[in-house]
Amino acid sequence: MNVRRAKTAGFCMGVSLALQKLNTALERRAGQSAGAGRICTLGPIIHNPQVLAEYETRGVVCVNDPAQLRQDDVAVIRAHGITRQVEQAVCASGATVVDATCPKVKKAQLSIARATSQGATLLLFGEEDHPEVRGLISYACGPAHVFGNAVELAALPLDPAQPYVLASQTTQDREIFTSIQESLSRALDDLTILSTICDATRERQEEARNIASSVDVMVVVGGRQSGNTRRLADVAALNGIATYHVESAEELEPKNFANKPRVGLTAGASTPKSLIDAAEKWLSSL
């Protein structure tokens, strides 16, 4: 089988930085005396089950409530960021805080705060229950609405005479956002547009589209909780070919690749190279 592997597959800059900060915290704690505080993350550091399981074996504790923190803990903020309110509670806990928020997400948070400082309504394109989106919304100084598609946007009671700010979750589909941007620009008199989709997301999606147009089937490797991985699968599937989103090579089935000699392989921004390598090896063996 001919496997075409995406060059952009695997860890993005934000994920690499977050894990580097977590590893540094673990190394420093290892050099301290017994009985030192815990290394904690505020929610999963990234959305990949294998990576999270590895850190759990190394003693990292995942907490979802700042009230669970102790003064001698090191609290590592997840790559997706957290809400302003949670961050304040973390700082008040007395724990040592390590901010591993992706720089692109942090920039989006601050851009939203500045753009809405006079009370403009935020329109955020994203997944309402995603931790990054909850964090972005918390930085809005005025009202805020989250929508996941054009239908949800059309249902919002927008007043053309009021000021609005349009932004996006950093891992959303760039083409869909551009279409939404053009539509709102025609409908609203006062619209500020923030470019918050990161370049890595755009490049991965463009490469996935390109590969999907020249193969018989696509495989996307990554955690099912990973929004950017799910969107890569969606982008590939739009080309009309079978697309399989798996967390590891163990989920691949030979029957899905029968009479399909060309396969495309990509992976989410939180997928380790080892998992991509394993999937490529499995596919190449067919």
Swiss-Prot record:
<feature type="binding site">
    <location>
        <position position="80"/>
    </location>
    <ligand>
        <name>(2E)-4-hydroxy-3-methylbut-2-enyl diphosphate</name>
    </ligand>
</feature>
<feature type="binding site">
    <location>
        <position position="47"/>
    </location>
    <ligand>
        <name>dimethylallyl diphosphate</name>
    </ligand>
</feature>
<dbReference type="GO" id="GO:0050992">
    <property type="term" value="P:dimethylallyl diphosphate biosynthetic process"/>
</dbReference>
<feature type="binding site">
    <location>
        <position position="228"/>
    </location>
    <ligand>
        <name>(2E)-4-hydroxy-3-methylbut-2-enyl diphosphate</name>
    </ligand>
</feature>
<keyword id="KW-0479">Metal-binding</keyword>
<feature type="binding site">
    <location>
        <position position="80"/>
    </location>
    <ligand>
        <name>dimethylallyl diphosphate</name>
    </ligand>
</feature>
<dbReference type="GO" id="GO:0019288">
    <property type="term" value="P:isopentenyl diphosphate biosynthetic process, methylerythritol 4-phosphate pathway"/>
</dbReference>
<dbReference type="GO" id="GO:0016114">
    <property type="term" value="P:terpenoid biosynthetic process"/>
</dbReference>
<feature type="binding site">
    <location>
        <position position="130"/>
    </location>
    <ligand>
        <name>(2E)-4-hydroxy-3-methylbut-2-enyl diphosphate</name>
    </ligand>
</feature>
<keyword id="KW-0411">Iron-sulfur</keyword>
<dbReference type="GO" id="GO:0051539">
    <property type="term" value="F:4 iron, 4 sulfur cluster binding"/>
</dbReference>
<feature type="binding site">
    <location>
        <position position="226"/>
    </location>
    <ligand>
        <name>(2E)-4-hydroxy-3-methylbut-2-enyl diphosphate</name>
    </ligand>
</feature>
<dbReference type="GO" id="GO:0046872">
    <property type="term" value="F:metal ion binding"/>
</dbReference>
<feature type="binding site">
    <location>
        <position position="270"/>
    </location>
    <ligand>
        <name>isopentenyl diphosphate</name>
    </ligand>
</feature>
<dbReference type="InterPro" id="IPR003451">
    <property type="entry name" value="LytB/IspH"/>
</dbReference>
<comment type="similarity">
    <text>Belongs to the IspH family.</text>
</comment>
<feature type="binding site">
    <location>
        <position position="47"/>
    </location>
    <ligand>
        <name>isopentenyl diphosphate</name>
    </ligand>
</feature>
<feature type="binding site">
    <location>
        <position position="130"/>
    </location>
    <ligand>
        <name>dimethylallyl diphosphate</name>
    </ligand>
</feature>
<protein>
    <recommendedName>
        <fullName>4-hydroxy-3-methylbut-2-enyl diphosphate reductase</fullName>
        <ecNumber>1.17.7.4</ecNumber>
    </recommendedName>
</protein>
<feature type="binding site">
    <location>
        <position position="47"/>
    </location>
    <ligand>
        <name>(2E)-4-hydroxy-3-methylbut-2-enyl diphosphate</name>
    </ligand>
</feature>
<keyword id="KW-0408">Iron</keyword>
<feature type="binding site">
    <location>
        <position position="80"/>
    </location>
    <ligand>
        <name>isopentenyl diphosphate</name>
    </ligand>
</feature>
<feature type="binding site">
    <location>
        <position position="198"/>
    </location>
    <ligand>
        <name>[4Fe-4S] cluster</name>
    </ligand>
</feature>
<feature type="active site" description="Proton donor">
    <location>
        <position position="132"/>
    </location>
</feature>
<feature type="binding site">
    <location>
        <position position="228"/>
    </location>
    <ligand>
        <name>isopentenyl diphosphate</name>
    </ligand>
</feature>
<dbReference type="GO" id="GO:0051745">
    <property type="term" value="F:4-hydroxy-3-methylbut-2-enyl diphosphate reductase activity"/>
</dbReference>
<feature type="binding site">
    <location>
        <position position="102"/>
    </location>
    <ligand>
        <name>[4Fe-4S] cluster</name>
    </ligand>
</feature>
<feature type="binding site">
    <location>
        <position position="226"/>
    </location>
    <ligand>
        <name>isopentenyl diphosphate</name>
    </ligand>
</feature>
<comment type="pathway">
    <text>Isoprenoid biosynthesis; isopentenyl diphosphate biosynthesis via DXP pathway; isopentenyl diphosphate from 1-deoxy-D-xylulose 5-phosphate: step 6/6.</text>
</comment>
<keyword id="KW-0414">Isoprene biosynthesis</keyword>
<feature type="binding site">
    <location>
        <position position="270"/>
    </location>
    <ligand>
        <name>dimethylallyl diphosphate</name>
    </ligand>
</feature>
<feature type="binding site">
    <location>
        <position position="228"/>
    </location>
    <ligand>
        <name>dimethylallyl diphosphate</name>
    </ligand>
</feature>
<keyword id="KW-0560">Oxidoreductase</keyword>
<feature type="binding site">
    <location>
        <position position="130"/>
    </location>
    <ligand>
        <name>isopentenyl diphosphate</name>
    </ligand>
</feature>
<feature type="binding site">
    <location>
        <position position="170"/>
    </location>
    <ligand>
        <name>(2E)-4-hydroxy-3-methylbut-2-enyl diphosphate</name>
    </ligand>
</feature>
<keyword id="KW-0004">4Fe-4S</keyword>
<comment type="pathway">
    <text>Isoprenoid biosynthesis; dimethylallyl diphosphate biosynthesis; dimethylallyl diphosphate from (2E)-4-hydroxy-3-methylbutenyl diphosphate: step 1/1.</text>
</comment>
<comment type="function">
    <text>Catalyzes the conversion of 1-hydroxy-2-methyl-2-(E)-butenyl 4-diphosphate (HMBPP) into a mixture of isopentenyl diphosphate (IPP) and dimethylallyl diphosphate (DMAPP). Acts in the terminal step of the DOXP/MEP pathway for isoprenoid precursor biosynthesis.</text>
</comment>
<feature type="binding site">
    <location>
        <position position="12"/>
    </location>
    <ligand>
        <name>[4Fe-4S] cluster</name>
    </ligand>
</feature>
<feature type="binding site">
    <location>
        <position position="270"/>
    </location>
    <ligand>
        <name>(2E)-4-hydroxy-3-methylbut-2-enyl diphosphate</name>
    </ligand>
</feature>
<feature type="binding site">
    <location>
        <position position="226"/>
    </location>
    <ligand>
        <name>dimethylallyl diphosphate</name>
    </ligand>
</feature>
<dbReference type="Pfam" id="PF02401">
    <property type="entry name" value="LYTB"/>
</dbReference>
